[in-house]
């Protein structure tokens, strides 16, 4: 039995680089319904409360960013806001969408520097979404793969395949929520 245990440790020692791969891609945190960004609640963080989850991950060597999207906006709006906060550029909800809902297509003061302007298929991201943030992440993945004809938005007029390495969700209502009937 001791031989088996020692053999196991030797295998782990020699192959640990294969067994425990390092993450080289940024992690994006997306808050849920009624959530907030890092700068919006003082020293109380959506991701960690009085503890700073983003900072803890950074101290462990990860590149991590938290987006701040509309707390009660649609997943479509939140996904587009997420895209521009990560990539950078003037927020653009799209021509058809803006005209159909009579909203401002390119809101003033929504021109983002971008957390990770290098974002591409060669530089993908990991997304962690909590609650509605998971739905927002899935909508973003859908919009990245969608190319809309006659659209001028950078996001909606191009197809971006392979830009998301993984999506992890925490308490996301993927099949809907029982909250809606209660609220109506």
Language model segments and positions:
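Intrinsically disordered, low-complexity boundary segments flanking structured domains
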Residues: 14-15, 51-54, 154-156
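Serine-dependent carboxylesterase/thioesterase catalytic core
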Residues: 31, 83-86, 90-184
């Amino acid at each position: 039995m001791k031989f088996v245990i020692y053999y196991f440790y030797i295998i782990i020692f020699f192959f640990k680089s294969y067994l425990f791969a390092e993450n080289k891609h940024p992690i994006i945190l997306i808050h849920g319904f009624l959530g907030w960004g890092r700068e919006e609640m003082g020293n109380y963080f959506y991701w960690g409360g009085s503890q700073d989850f983003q900072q803890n991950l950074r101290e462990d060597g990860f590149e991590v960013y938290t987006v701040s999207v509309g707390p009660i906006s649609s997943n479509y709006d939140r996904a587009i806001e997420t895209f521009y906060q990560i990539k950078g550029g003037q927020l653009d909800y799209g021509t058809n969408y803006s005209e159909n809902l009579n909203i401002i297509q390119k809101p003033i003061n929504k021109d983002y520097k971008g957390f990770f302007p290098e974002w591409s298929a060669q530089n993908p991201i990991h997304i962690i979404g909590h609650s509605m943030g998971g739905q927002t992440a899935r909508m973003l993945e859908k919009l990245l793969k969608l190319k809309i004809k006659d659209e001028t938005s950078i996001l909606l007029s191009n197809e971006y395949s392979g830009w998301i390495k993984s999506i992890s969700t925490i308490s996301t209502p993927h099949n809907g929520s029982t909250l809606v009937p209660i609220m109506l």
